[in-house]
């Protein structure tokens, strides 16, 4: 039987939601991750240090794993203050602030409409060593949804990188060759997370033979040429790319609707799905760096010291999984996953 032992991985982009669903989402993500960076786009958004620490307490209250720890982030708004950034940084639990362009994704209505308005905050973040996480899409209606990431790189991200060269920036859940190339060519303070579903799927999986709502996420799946570029970047061994699932659960009812929510649930099998990608590319030797080393190295945090073991043993993903009082349909529902964490 084929086995693979790696340093315990981390998830640098995770949505746990809030309320009664936390019991399920924390269980799934805590099964083998050492740490997870928790996204702040709740309703209302996590915009203050107190809100972030309170959210962390709610997560920890249902966290039964002694190897899993949540890392928190703030939701950046045009009203965020420099004092709030300093206060958050001083806690030791909040390591980043997330820039959501207003209207770009789930619960992003409180996001930033004009990046220039948060430039004073970015200056403070650069001084304090607080990382900037970015959902990299423009939201103007004249830009096609498949082009919003590329346009963001040219019009928003490039000026930020130029104006704040010492600010550490993570371009989250990249979906295009353009984004992968931007990160590769940028300086050492720019990195990116890549999801399992953007490595495994392209827009044909979502649209051919009928609409598959559980593949609908933001940024949206792109054509296969972009998928191949993401696979190359993720498996390359470059320290600029690391694991961030963007596992984003919604109830089955909210996904299978006339106006369905954006987000795919992969926390139930994230490392197993990434392992498939690396195996298919003949790059299993690079999985540990992508999953376990590059993230903490970029965040200036220690690597995990324990390990997990994956076994090449197929198992069938449940059709649905518990999600508070509802159910969530996970990626690969009813289908085989080729690796299993023992």
UniProtKB/Swiss-Prot annotation:
Modified residues (N6-carboxylysine): 98
Cofactor binding summary note: Binds 2 Zn(2+) ions per subunit.
Binding-site positions, Zn(2+) 1: 13, 15, 98, 246
Its EC number(s): 3.5.2.3
Hydrolase is among the record's keywords: yes
Enzyme type, top EC level: hydrolase
Pfam families: Amidohydro_1
Family: Belongs to the metallo-dependent hydrolases superfamily. DHOase family. Class II DHOase subfamily.
Name of the featured protein: Dihydroorotase
Organism: Aliivibrio salmonicida (strain LFI1238)
Gene: pyrC
């Amino acid at each position: 039987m084929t086995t693979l032992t790696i340093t315990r991985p981390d998830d640098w982009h995770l949505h746990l939601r809030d309320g009664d669903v936390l019991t399920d989402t924390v269980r799934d993500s805590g099964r083998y991750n050492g740490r997870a960076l928790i996204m702040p786009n709740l309703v209302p958004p996590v915009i203050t240090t107190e809100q972030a620490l309170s959210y962390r307490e709610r997560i920890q209250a249902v966290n039964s794993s002694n190897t899993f720890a949540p890392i928190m982030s703030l939701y950046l708004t045009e009203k965020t203050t420099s004092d709030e950034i300093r206060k958050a940084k001083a806690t030791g639990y909040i390591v980043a602030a997330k820039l959501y362009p207003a209207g770009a994704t789930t619960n992003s209505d409180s996001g930033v409409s004009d990046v220039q308005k948060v430039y004073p905050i970015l200056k403070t973040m650069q001084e304090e060593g607080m990382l900037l996480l970015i959902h990299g899409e423009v939201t103007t209606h004249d830009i096609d949804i498949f082009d919003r990431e590329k346009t963001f790189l040219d019009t928003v991200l490039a000026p930020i990188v130029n104006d704040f060269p010492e600010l550490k920036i993570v371009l989250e859940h990249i979906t295009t060759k353009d984004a992968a190339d931007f990160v590769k060519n940028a300086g050492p303070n720019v990195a990116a997370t890549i999801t399992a579903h953007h490595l495994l799927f392209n827009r044909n999986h979502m649209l051919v033979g009928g609409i598959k709502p559980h593949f609908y996420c933001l940024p949206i799946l792109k054509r296969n040429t972009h998928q191949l570029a993401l696979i190359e970047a993720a498996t390359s061994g470059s320290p600029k790319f690391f694991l961030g699932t963007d596992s984003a659960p919604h109830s089955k009812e909210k996904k299978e609707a006339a106006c369905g929510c954006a987000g795919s649930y992969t926390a139930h099998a994230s490392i197993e799905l990434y392992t498939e990608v690396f195996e298919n590319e003949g790059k299993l030797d690079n999985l540990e760096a992508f999953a376990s080393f590059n993230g903490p190295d970029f965040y200036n945090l220690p690597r995990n010291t324990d390990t997990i073991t994956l076994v090449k043993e197929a198992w069938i993903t449940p059709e649905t999984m518990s999600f508070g009082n509802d159910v969530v349909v996970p990626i690969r529902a009813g289908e085989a996953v080729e690796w299993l964490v023992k």
